[in-house]
A protein has these predicted regions:
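Auxiliary Fe-S-binding modules of radical SAM enzymes
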Residues: 120-242
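Conserved AdoMet/S-adenosylmethionine-binding subsite of the radical SAM
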Residues: 9-154, 158-166
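Active-site groove signature of glycoside hydrolases
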Residues: 2-7
Length: 242
């Protein structure tokens, strides 16, 4: 189960607890994990420190874990500066003490973090703080995409150069990834195959599990910033899963 939004941790704890309790009381046999996606650690770590219901929120996390369910906090950090305050260090420590695991994700954003050195620093710092680098996303095709997006090839090069700088403990991260119609599509690189320059892609998640982790190819387009701008390579009319 995934709680996302918006930001579900905008909710008061008693409201969130109502949803959680209903899930726990249902005693679902196939429920093993609850994920909560939130940027609160970066913009308001006091949600876990001094807010009126901060202790109640942490107690709720403990309750989830004590029921034998893995609780994953999917924390959004866009820049290493967001990891530099004492408040965020304390908040991360308090969350981890509940038994919850923190995993991190962020889009690569033009004007903000389109620099491999920033990503390497951020991932390494996250490991030092006991949290797990998880995803580098491509900026979604919504909102101010024209301002924040970068070409897919540039996103891949940023990911690759950052990945080369970190140890294996930080190489849990995957990217650059687009959350698009087929599922989660990762850009593995740019290559020349049969005299054609192509993007090499794969689906980390797909509506049809049979297609997960199977490579596929798109025509190289130096200006493409999203999946819907890609066309099948090698003269094919559609991708193999369409």
């Amino acid at each position: 189960i995934l709680f996302t939004g918006g930001d579900p941790l905008f909710m008061k704890t008693k409201i969130l607890e109502g949803y959680i309790d209903a899930i726990l009381q249902a005693d679902l046999p196939n429920l093993r994990t609850i994920r909560i996606g939130s940027k609160s650690l970066s913009y308001w770590p006091y949600r876990f420190l001094t807010d009126n219901d901060a202790d109640a929120l942490l107690a709720l996390f403990e309750k989830i874990v004590s029921n034998g369910i893995h609780l994953a906090i999917m924390a959004h950090f866009n820049h290493p500066r967001e990891l530099s305050t004492t408040a965020v260090e304390l908040a991360i420590s308090r969350i981890r003490q509940t038994g919850a695991q923190i995993r991190t994700q962020s889009p690569v954003l033009n004007h903000i973090n389109n620099d491999p050195d920033l990503w390497a620093t951020m991932w390494q710092r996250q490991v030092e703080m006991g949290i797990i680098p998880y995803y580098m996303f491509v900026a979604r095709n919504t909102g101010a995409q024209h301002y924040f997006s970068i070409p897919l090839e540039e996103a891949w090069r940023i990911f690759r150069k950052a990945y080369q700088q970190v140890s294996g403990l930080a190489r849990t991260v995957r990217g650059p990834v687009m959350s698009c119609d087929p599922g989660k599509v990762q850009v593995l690189g740019v290559s020349d195959i049969m005299n054609e320059k192509v993007y090499v892609l794969r689906a980390l998640q797909h509506r049809n599990p049979k297609h997960v982790m199977k490579p596929f190819y798109a025509q190289y387009d130096p200006h493409a910033i999203w999946y819907n701008q890609l066309k099948p390579a090698f003269g094919k009319e559609k991708f193999f899963f369409e």
